[in-house]
Each structure stands twice: as structure tokens, then as C-alpha cells.
Amino acid sequence: MSTFAILPVKRFEGAKGRLAGGLAAGPRRALAEAMYVDVLTALRRTQGVDRVLVLTADPGAQRVAEGYDAIPLDDPAEAGQNRAVMRGVAHARELGATRVLCLSGDTPMLDPADLDALLGRPRTADRYVVIVPDRHGEGTNGLLLCPPDGMKPSYGVDSCARHKALAEEAGLAVEIAEIPSVALDVDTPDDLDALRELIASRRGGAAHTRGMLNQLLRTNPKN
């Protein structure tokens, strides 16, 4: 079994616009970069992941990917998460992947042990999908596909239920796996507050994001 992780990453410039009410453009960019590096760090430490593909149009993100032994793939069209993932799936198959794990670049609390448990769990079906919901149980923060092209991704509002329906239509065995370290992605001020609380409650993990938030707190206590 050869497992590739697929990681679509938006440009850092103008990133996390929904946080603009509380964070200026510079800190938002720094936060996006820090979270991305933490995700790459976790994936590099995950034994069950053989290769990581990063889909991005951001030159800086491409350079960082190379530094973490990931394969950067240019995403010049920037046509959205679904098309980026599909392009990643096609490239993964060309390189011999037998399954893919699609993740998000803004889930900095990713725990390699959680990912290895997910990937190493015995399954009776040869064709399956495992959906990891976001913390609200509505979106999709993780999508494990075997085979990689078993179904087309359909990210967006209420994607968890939609992915389940699409998998069933495709004849795939479906599993919903609630994994706290994968469930928290950061898009809104509430998400950022939840991340701060989670980081404060744990000693390890998300080193780059933790450092960035601590620096932000020192320079601007209101944030």
C-alpha cells in the first residue's frame, strides 16, 4: 500500500481574509505560513505517508514544500480546492499511489500518531473512503481515498454529508472518523480562539503556530 498525502495551499498573500477584523494582513500571512509548516512537519513524521504532494501557486509555499521533502505542484489556475485535489490525485496515481489522504494546510494541530492510527487501521473492504469531519461535523478536513480516484471530491459547505453520499453512490465502503487533531481548521475568529485554547491546553504540537501566536500576543495584546 502506497499512501500519498495531498495538500492544497492557497497563496499566502491575502490569506485568511475572514480574520481581517482582528488581524492585519501581515499577521494573517504569518499565521497561514506557520500553520502550513506545522502540517508539513506532522506529515513528515507520519510513518504511513510515503510522499506528500503540495498543490499551490505560491512560490514561497513551493520552496517550503521542497524543504520538507514534499513535491510541489504548481496550481496556476487556482480553480479551487476540488480541482487542486483532483490534479493531485492524478499525479499521485502516476507516481504509483494506491490511496491518497487529502488534508488542509490550516490544521496545525495534526498529530502524526493520529494519522498513523487512521492509516494503519485494518479494513475489510478493498475500496473505501474515510471522511474526517471538521469540528462542527459539517465540513471535510480529511479524506482518505482507496483507490485514489474512487470518487471525485466535493469540498464546500456541508461537504461531509455530500462526500458520504458520493462515496455510497460510487460503491465505496464509508467510514466517518472523528479525529480532534484534524478537526480544527482556522478560518474564522471563533476558529482562532478555539486554536488558542487547544494550544494552551497541550504542551506539544503546532510549534510554529504556537510561536507565531505568542509573538503576536507580545506585540499586540489585543490580538
Swiss-Prot record:
Reaction catalysed by this enzyme: phosphoenolpyruvate + GTP + H(+) = enolpyruvoyl-2-diphospho-5'-guanosine + diphosphate
Organism (species): Conexibacter woesei (strain DSM 14684 / CCUG 47730 / CIP 108061 / JCM 11494 / NBRC 100937 / ID131577)
Job of this protein: Guanylyltransferase that catalyzes the activation of phosphoenolpyruvate (PEP) as enolpyruvoyl-2-diphospho-5'-guanosine, via the condensation of PEP with GTP. It is involved in the biosynthesis of coenzyme F420, a hydride carrier cofactor.
Ligand binding (phosphoenolpyruvate): T140, G156, S159
Keywords for this protein: GTP-binding, Nucleotide-binding, Nucleotidyltransferase, Transferase
EC number: 2.7.7.105
UniProt superkingdom: Bacteria
Single annotated GO MF: GTP binding
Name of the molecule in the record: Phosphoenolpyruvate guanylyltransferase
Cystine crosslinks: none
Alphabetical list of InterPro entries matching this protein: CofC, Nucleotide-diphossugar_trans
Family named by the database record: Belongs to the CofC family.
SUPFAM superfamilies, per the entry: Nucleotide-diphospho-sugar transferases
Pathway(s) the chain acts in: Cofactor biosynthesis; coenzyme F420 biosynthesis
Gene3D superfamilies the record matches: Spore Coat Polysaccharide Biosynthesis Protein SpsA, Chain A (3.90.550.10)
A Pfam family this chain is assigned to: CofC
GO BP annotation list: F420-0 metabolic process
